[in-house]
Amino acid sequence: MVRVVCERVSEASGIEFPPELTEFRAAPNPRGGVTLRGKVGYRGPLQPPTLPKIQFDLTTDEVIIRPPVLRPIYHSYSDRPAQPARIHCYPIDEVLAEKTRAMGERGRPRDLYDIIRLSRSGRQVLQLDAAAEREILERKCAHRGLPIPTLAALEASPNWVELESEWANMLGHQLPALPPLDTYRADLAVYFDWLSGAPVADLPAITEAEASDPAWQPPAAVALPSEWGVAAPLEGIRFAGANRLLLELDYRPQKGQPGVRLVEPYSFRYSRKGYLLFYGRNIERQRITAYRADRIMGVKVTTQPFRPIWRVEL
């Protein structure tokens, strides 16, 4: 079955899948079920000395609480198909529960990182329900015979010491800029407060500099040519906002002094005049500012965190 799929992909893309680099093995899990683990190596256009491999973990021993959602496979390149391929995925609330359970089991840096990224968006943008989220988590943990993770239990675990020492080693090479662990530890406490039903303050939305189109919704990815013919680096802005990191924004206003501003990123809005606007708090001026996206020349994500005073919508 796997080799048939590899042959079809190879015919459509030209990517080679050497048969000797395809390997699957069955392994028992702690509950007496079977997990199928495998790797599929491939040779693409870059021709690295060591061929990369795709890793698979397949199991029937898992409880699915929410109905899967059909989502398009993200493809940011120019050769993306007109009709993107779609696959069934966990909804966000179930992914968050999976990550929280994993945090209790192994406590790896990527688990903490994903919990905070998902919970920030889940609470503030997607409006996830805390009681429903806790119910999903309880059922996930019960399936594996695990206690519900708590902040105290996580910090008392030997895994936490390893997480602290491996934060930079395991995440630094995967991210444009590495957020400080302290900010994620602080937000983990907020997440568990929310999960327990405690009230968590909701920050106000930014004050707009000009009226925006209320019907506009930001796309999954933003690509926009600037007035100078180069792509405005808007995904860097999104990354900084989602990770609560300051930006060095190289901006060329229609009037005023061009140059680099240190900015807290908050939101994209689409003005009634037809401009995509980035709203950020200018640190030097201590005020929210609307920046036209097509006038942004460059973005550098710093490792300096900020504590939002408005709702981050990125």
Each model region followed by its residue ranges:
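Core beta-strand-centered patch of the WYL/Sm-like small regulatory domain
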Residues: 49-83, 215-314
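Structured mid-to-C-terminal alpha-helical surface segments
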Residues: 1-226, 312
